[in-house]
C-alpha cells in the first residue's frame, strides 16, 4: 500500500512483472523492431514487434505449443530446446515479413548466461535474423539439442525407474523416450527449416549480394 507524498505506485504491468518501462522506452526510441521473448511455467512465446504511434504492431509470432500441434514436438514446451525452436520459428516468420534486424527484449527476465530466453535468441540468429548480442550469453549447443536432458533421463532410468517415469511422464505419454530427445529435436528443427526453405534461400542470396 502507498505511503507518503513522494511514493509512486508502479504501473500495473510493472507490478505484474511484465514490463520494464525504462528499457521499453529506450528500445522504442531506437525505432527498431523488438524481438520479444517471454516465458511462463508452461510455455515460451516470441513476438517481433514494431512500435507505432497508435500502439505496438506484431509482425511475427510463435508459441511453443505450436511445436506440438503443428510440428509434432513430443518434448516439453518450456525447456531450452523448445525455446530455441520457438525463436527459430518466430524469426523465420519475421524474415518472411521482410524484417531482417531487431533488438532483443527479454522484459523482466534475468539475463542469466545460457537462459531459455537466450536459447530463443540463438534460434533467431541461426535463422538469419540480425540481433545485437554477446556470444557469452548463448547456451551451449549440447543444451540446445537437449543432450543434458537425455543424459539425466538415462541416468535416472537406471538408478530410479519410478522417479524416471514420474519426471518424464509427459514425454512417455506422448511416445518419446527422453533419451532420444536430441534426435527428435533435429527432426522437428528440420521440419521447420524445410517449411521456410524459400525464405532461407532468399536471405542467403541477399547476403551473398551484399558481400
Swiss-Prot record:
One of its GO terms (biological process) is ribosomal large subunit assembly. Pfam families: Ribosomal_L5e. One of its GO terms (molecular function) is structural constituent of ribosome. GO terms for cellular component: cytosolic large ribosomal subunit. The keyword Ribosomal protein applies. This is one of the proteins that bind and probably mediate the attachment of the 5S RNA into the large ribosomal subunit, where it forms part of the central protuberance. This is Large ribosomal subunit protein uL18. The gene is rpl18.
